[in-house]
Amino acid sequence: MNAIAAEAGITKPILYRHFGDKGGLYAALAKRHTDALLDSLRAALDAPAERRERVEATLDTYLAAIEARPQVYRFLMHPAEGSPGDQGFDVGKHSAPLLRRMGEELAQVIEERLDLGPGSQQLARVWGHGIVGMMHAAGDWWLGERPCSRAELVRGLADLLWGRLAAAGDKVGGPGF
């Protein structure tokens, strides 16, 4: 909280007066950044391009967002390691709903756009949450280690997803995936 107040150019008491505690600050940042990220991901999915290009653009949008603001990403997704002042703050309790929200949003897009056959609603949720989990885990690993370029990671993740996404037909009357 000291670093956040200093970066904002205010005192810590003013920060606490506005947000109450770290949980209040977390909730405000989480909403703001998740809303912006989801808007960007929707734009990538809706771009006038071939399906494979949109898949890659969506993956790249997520990775670009966490790369552009790594401190915000770490604050939202990871506890401050070894910081005694943060012992009562459970980031996992707060970050799980963010990932769940992203998974449900992606599941809705998949359900609306792809013909997955019988059980499509459940399968869309499996895919939505699975893809979000993959993006989160791979992005977290990549941001911490930088073992390859962002473009290489995007291609690798898209290759992993592509088999079944390429085979699924668009839903009749839907906007297409």
Where are these regions (language model features)?
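Hydrophobic alpha-helical connector segments
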Residues: 28, 43-71, 154
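Amphipathic alpha-helical packing segments from all-alpha helical-bundle domains
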Residues: 86-115, 122-133, 137, 152-163
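Secondary-structure edge/capping motif, primarily at the C-terminal ends of alpha-helices
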Residues: 41-48, 76-84, 138-146
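Helix-turn-helix
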Residues: 1-24, 28
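Long amphipathic alpha-helical segments
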Residues: 144-148, 168-177
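Short, hydrophobic secondary-structure boundary micro-motifs
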Residues: 74-77, 85, 119, 151, ...
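Generic hydrophobic, amphipathic alpha-helix propensity
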Residues: 4, 29-33, 37, 41, ...
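Alpha-helical DNA-contacting segments of helix-turn-helix folds
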Residues: 19, 26-33, 76, 95-98
